[in-house]
Swiss-Prot record:
GO molecular function, one term: cysteine-type deubiquitinase activity
Domain of life: Eukaryota
Residue ranges of the region described as Cys-loop: 155-161
PANTHER family listed in its UniProt record: DEUBIQUITINASE OTUD6B, OTU DOMAIN CONTAINING PROTEIN
Region ranges (Variable-loop): 222-232
Biased amino acid composition, Basic and acidic residues: 111-120
Function as written in the Swiss-Prot or TrEMBL entry: Deubiquitinating enzyme that may play a role in the ubiquitin-dependent regulation of different cellular processes.
Name this protein carries in UniProt: Deubiquitinase OTUD6B
Annotated region described as Disordered, given as residue ranges: 85-120
E.C. no: 3.4.19.12
Positions of the OTU domain: 150-287
Gene3D superfamilies found in the cross-reference section: 3.90.70.80
GO biological process, one term: proteolysis
Length: 294
């Protein structure tokens, strides 16, 4: 290509577009570096922004070339086109560098560093936990359940765990009772038989037995909040369902509530050290031996 061809409008425009594409790619790389990998929401938005930016640049470059092909070649046109292209603020050094020095970018980087530090602490805690109470408890429970050809069925730790575990087992038996149903029936049963439950409920501040008002609130909370359920609620549910409820524990023998009933027992797993949040209930299911047999 001679000097004249190199300085033609088309050659200059193509050269300028190539430069612009490189600058856009630099900006895209900067955008990628500015968003933490574990921030899925922002990375999804970033991916959409990048795709939109690339599509806009590609479309505009095509329009510029088509427009150039339809116009007579004049020296002033080259200046007009190239000036218009260079004036576009897509990949200049200032926008590329700006995210690294802006206050917003610094806040994002600080947040990303804090999230990384938190993830590192969680990872360290998980490693330490391999010899901790939670791991030992899980191992012991797995051994106890395996002897019955059962395994733990994980239940979310959201305050409803006991009710969800019972719901799971009832559903396995074809019973469609929900957590809401179980909570409502539990509260109703306890309210109608307050004398059977009041002696076991005390005010944590005074140590005194619940008043009628406190007991009423306790029952209302069972229905309207994710209040954690315990042995009193299990006793009520055993009578409601006319079914024994067996609670397996790692550190002591199983507890059976409602032994007077002959229906197939509901089996729960009580975990004292689960999730670092304290007491928790899981359900059980048949042991999956497919991995061992494969």
């Amino acid at each position: 290509m001679d000097v004249a061809e190199e300085n033609s409008e088309e050659a200059l425009l193509i050269k300028q577009q190539r430069k612009e594409k490189k600058e856009v790619q630099a900006k895209i790389q900067c955008m990628k570096n500015s968003v933490p990998k574990n921030d899925k929401k922002r990375r999804k938005q970033m991916t959409e922004d990048i795709a939109k930016l690339e599509a806009e640049v590609e479309a505009r470059h095509k329009e510029e070339l088509e427009a150039l092909a339809q116009k007579p070649t004049e020296p002033t046109q080259v200046s007009s086109i190239t000036n218009g292209v260079t004036s576009l603020d897509l990949g200049s050094e200032e926008p590329v560098q700006q995210p690294r020095v802006s206050k917003a970018q610094k806040r994002r980087e600080k947040k990303a560093a804090q999230e990384k530090e938190r993830d590192d602490r969680i990872a360290e805690a998980e490693i330490a936990n391999l010899s901790g109470a939670r791991h030992l408890e899980s191992q012991k429970l797995a051994q106890i359940l395996a002897e019955r050809e059962l395994q733990i069925r994980q239940i979310p730790s959201d305050g409803h765990c006991m009710y969800r575990a019972i719901e799971h087992q009832l559903n396995e038996q074809g019973n469609s009772l929900t957590v809401a149903n179980l909570r409502s029936q539990t509260a109703d049963y306890m309210q109608k038989r307050a004398e059977d439950f009041l002696p076991f409920l005390t005010n944590s501040s005074t140590g005194d037995m619940y008043t009628q008002e406190e007991f009423q609130k306790y029952c209302t909370d069972i229905v309207n909040t994710p209040a954690w359920g315990g042995q009193l609620e299990l006793r009520a549910l055993s009578h409601i369902l006319k079914t024994p409820i067996e609670v397996i524990q790692a550190e002591s023998l199983p507890i059976v509530i409602g032994e007077e009933y002959s229906n197939k027992p509901i089996t729960l797993v009580y975990m004292r050290h689960a999730y670092g949040l304290g007491e928790h209930y899981n359900s059980v299911e048949q042991l999956d031996t497919s991995t061992e047999n494969s």
